[in-house]
């Protein structure tokens, strides 16, 4: 998996940056501590690694790991103070009429195995995601950039669902337009549904 050097994007004495494949956890999820993860696969080759941020199991893309405590602390501070811009690209089922829009609906992360995250105006925590359309396709699909300014589990998927869209290959989240977003963004559904064998969400 990481034997392919093309998945090692950057390495020095302080950092390791890799392209994490879809279907691989960043670290154990608490339900199965022995399961294979990005860190467990990388540490035999690169030594002890500190997790700076996580990518959901289904999400592929750029994963940054620290190679010492000081670097880990410094990078954590940068992420916490929003000095690091996070951007994801996704393939959505449907075409929004707006080129960009914001979702600022509070999220409640459930603690079950699926980690299903829902919109909850009472118990949810403040969350914000900016969406912008990269391209629209005649098949009724669109390529969208998502920039989450908070970092909750499945935040992009939950906020996209509230926008009336879902990600190709997502078995968990289906479109459920929230009234506040439905007034801003109108969705043209896809002409035909395609089958994706993975979640089409990539950390850019």
Describe the function of each predicted region.
Residues 1-204:
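RNA pseudouridine synthases
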